[in-house]
């Protein structure tokens, strides 16, 4: 019999006190889509344990130095920083010259599906509207679609999920 009490049913959540979060950055020049399993071209990895703001700054400094040594930065228009929106990842857009943060597709899809899964027959239509707004870079339209989903959502728990998805997508625009 499991011991499940404290504020709610489920696993007892303990604070993480002795965890280390390694950081991983990889640079590539494109994607080879010839095979079923796509391959990143001219791949270079940076990684390790970089603790705190100073550690993250050190990591991005290493990445920036590699970019400057390997590429003619006068011809670079943008350096896309692709990730899940974690603060340390977004900070790459500040530390890397011409850096621009872009939410990765996996997390974007994950949150759009969370926001629309309860819509049954209308889920595909709602997803299409959100994706269309993203492709067209129409943040206001995406917000309007999320607001409409919130209006037609009955369950309070599901409304919280939709709101969290809306905040995540629009917050990482």
Give residue spans per PLM region.
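Catalytic center-proximal scaffold of phosphoryl-transfer enzymes
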Residues: 1-173
């Amino acid at each position: 019999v499991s011991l499940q009490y404290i504020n709610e049913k489920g696993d007892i959540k303990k604070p993480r006190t002795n965890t280390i979060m390694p950081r991983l950055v990889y640079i590539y020049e494109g994607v080879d889509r010839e095979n079923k399993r796509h391959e990143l071209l001219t791949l270079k990895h940076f990684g390790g344990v970089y603790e705190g703001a100073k550690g993250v700054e050190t990591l991005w400094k290493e990445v920036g130095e590699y970019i400057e040594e390997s590429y003619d930065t006068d011809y670079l228009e943008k350096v896309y920083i692709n990730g899940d929106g974690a603060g340390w990842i977004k900070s790459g857009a500040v530390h890397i010259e011409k850096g621009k943060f872009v939410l990765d597709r996996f997390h974007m899809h994950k949150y759009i599906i969370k926001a629309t899964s309860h819509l049954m027959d209308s889920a595909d239509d709602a997803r299409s509207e959100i994706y269309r707004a993203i492709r067209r870079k129409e943040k206001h339209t995406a917000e309007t679609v999320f607001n409409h989903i919130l209006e037609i959502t009955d369950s309070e728990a599901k409304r919280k999920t939709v709101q969290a998805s809306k905040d995540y997508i629009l917050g990482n625009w």
